[in-house]
Amino acid sequence: MWQKEEDKGEISIVKILDQNVVILMDPADVMNEEKVLGKNRTKEKQYAFDYAFDEDTPQQEVFKNTTKFLCEGVLNGYNSTVFAYGQTGAGKTYTMLGNEQNPGIMFNTMKEVFKQMKTHQVDRKYTIRVSFLEIYNENIKDLIMVSNEVLDLREDPIKGVCVAGLSEIEVHTPDEIFELLIYGNRNRTQEATEANQTSSRSHAVLQIICEYKEKDAGIKSEIKIGKLSLIDLAGSERAAKTGNRGLRMIEGANINKSLLALGNCINMLHENNIKNQSNYIPFRDSKLTRLLKDSLGGNCRTVMIANIAPSSSNYEDTHNTLKYANRAKNIKTNVQRNVLNVEHHIS
């Protein structure tokens, strides 16, 4: 909980059990420490996930239990996505980006990718490229090669959904990526609101493309391409709570619109999987959901990290986040290796 929440006399309404169960209590039932659990079980909400972390969990442990297992697949030509979802001020940017003292999932993932890559370099030649973009007010902008140009989403028959004109920087060490992360995050749109002093006003997407081919490949060779997308979503907002006016309110409305579109896609994918149906999924309702199309319903391994705020004033937002995360558990994707066949000409 934030200090300002404690100063207002707010209480924690969330408990973690056995590292995978989240219990959400109704604030009206939480009167003192003795009555936190079990007073009125009809109002308690319980959700089971693969892992549940409290506020004291080290960054490295979060990475190890959510993302580390994806790295080997990316190096072998499979797509993966990790995205942090939740209300504003719930710690999504800290989880994904972190800081110099406590790096988040983005940097820890890249360290692991380069570490595992070394074990394959005897018989493989790798190329690693990085891109970093933001979606701000439904406009896509490059966070590395900064300009006022708004980029377009395109449907590519081989790459799937991609961003036309987005820069991709070849990198050779995780430190290079960390420098790009810090630089790109400085270019990201951030403003203070009453709910969050460093509120991200955009969705940020870091993509790592890992290409490799066998060193002993002949005239005909295969290039395997794995793509890892690490996404820090802007947080859902309530105008009354954030105190937003003018441009901040417009930003908040666009953030909520894209998150609503994401929620609708999660709901439809959940329904399709539960009922074994193939109803239309409205991916085209926002730039965010178009970009996440493969991650949610296509050729990708995907991890959703739900960031929640445990204070009593955040009950509704926390409940909504947990419900979406619970539905997302039932979404199934179809993962396939990405192979590009190349024929070399001898002259």
Stretches with model-predicted labels:
Residues K141, S313-E316:
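Alpha-helical elements of the RecA-like P-loop NTPase motor core of helicases
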Residues Y94, S286, D317-N320:
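Extracytoplasmic/periplasmic beta-strand context in beta-sandwich domains
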Residues G184-T189, K323-K329:
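Charged, low-complexity, helix-prone segments enriched in Lys/Glu/Asp/Gln
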Residues A217, A239-K241, Y315-E316, I331-T333:
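Extended hydrophobic-aromatic, low-complexity segments
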